[in-house]
Amino acid sequence: MSIEVIFALNDNPSVLPPTEGFHYVDQGNYQTFELRQGQPLICYSDSATSCIITAVVASHGARTTVTLAHLDSPACISSFFDIVAAQAADSYRIYAQGANPPDNDTSKQNAAQLQTCVDNLGGKVTTAELSLLQGDPREHNRGEFGLAFDGGNLAVAGNQPFTLQLFQRDPSCGGQTVYCIMRRQEQPPRQIRDAALPFTHQELVELSSIALQFRKDASDPGSAFTNIVNLESEEIRQNWSTTPAYEAPWFSDQLKLGAAFAIAMAPVVSLSELHLRKTTPPSFARLRKVLLSR
């Protein structure tokens, strides 16, 4: 099936998402969708400042897929493109927006890493349209990006914004937010995950355990992740964002949701850690610790 992809950026106002065929991919995640005749879909992400939202349209013989990712660091970008390369597609068309504002160091590093990864795919890349380092992420819908497929032979890679509620961004009631913030505190650090896979009980327990103990400054109780529930929105942006002046309006509320989730998980963490140690095989993290201690 031959699908034409148009790269189209706009200043359109936000609209409600369709009730069917709409898929949101949050920060630190990717998800792959097959584009099938008669099945329209939209895959979408938002809130990007220094992050880069990337859509990779891959051709596999008669099949076409799109993989959407919200990438937030050079290591995350590199890990994602390892996954893309492993798909062993016949060709790739790559579209992206983000890495703003352009004078931010993280934005510059992310943009450079994305370009390197695209170049490393070599001749298989037939199209690369990358809108990076363009300006204020709050303007011209620069923080939004996705791909809309009409169910026929046309897809639009663009930045039409959608009006979403917190439960649509984080259906796990805060677990995704805890993952996003705490995943690099895991050993080894986790760069990216497949959003099509639900979190397991053990994953949420381990992430919540980290979140309950985490402080940005070990000597300052006020810097604890769980203390976010006591902070005003401006304090959250200043303390927990690398681009505090540019964050989306829902940034602070989403972090509060994650902190509340971790607090609510505290008794589950205590019970589960005891239960898991006694009745189930250790996680890879625990197994690694045992092996390295010998």
Regions found by a protein language model. Give the residues of each.
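C-terminal functional modules of predominantly eukaryotic multidomain proteins
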Residues: 2-26, 31, 104-294
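Conserved mixed alpha/beta catalytic, RNA-binding, or beta-rich assembly cores of soluble enzyme
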Residues: 36-88
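Gly/Ser/Thr-rich loops at beta-strand to alpha-helix junctions
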Residues: 47-51, 100-107
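Short beta-strand segments
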Residues: 55-57, 97-98, 148-150
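Acidic, glycine-rich active-site loops and adjacent beta-strand->loop/helix elements
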Residues: 71-74, 98-102
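Short glycine-rich phosphate-binding loop at a beta-alpha junction
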Residues: 90-99
